[in-house]
């Protein structure tokens, strides 16, 4: 299972194993969604919370805007039933993932460290990796939305910092201080 709750539980077990009962928690993008769920589920373990570049999953999906749908198309593509997205991606995994890299972070592949890029390519060519990526996004639509809906009225009682990129898809689409 790839729900943010399950991933958060895995991380809580790891922190316990490492000897940290309470800790500061920082997350970006998917990691921020996991951190948000961890803070809801285990508030007593979190000293402070920093979230970067997200809107809560329920809010994002419930108030979906065209700008976000275009920028985050992969949420809906990867969440389609198996083996649809896996088959399309596997047909040319380099093309798909390099397009993602160019759309999300760089303007040319030469801007990426070539050793890191080769490690990425080796990983994303693995059918099990592609399936896991799809399952992560399936969980957001199958489980995470409903979990967040159950917690809509909850407020966290801990120090928190929420940051986002000015001019990014979230900034353009939502009144982030109000979310």
Predicted regions: what they are:
Residues 2-26, 30-179:
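Flexible "cap/lid" subdomain of the alpha/beta-hydrolase fold that forms the substrate-access gate
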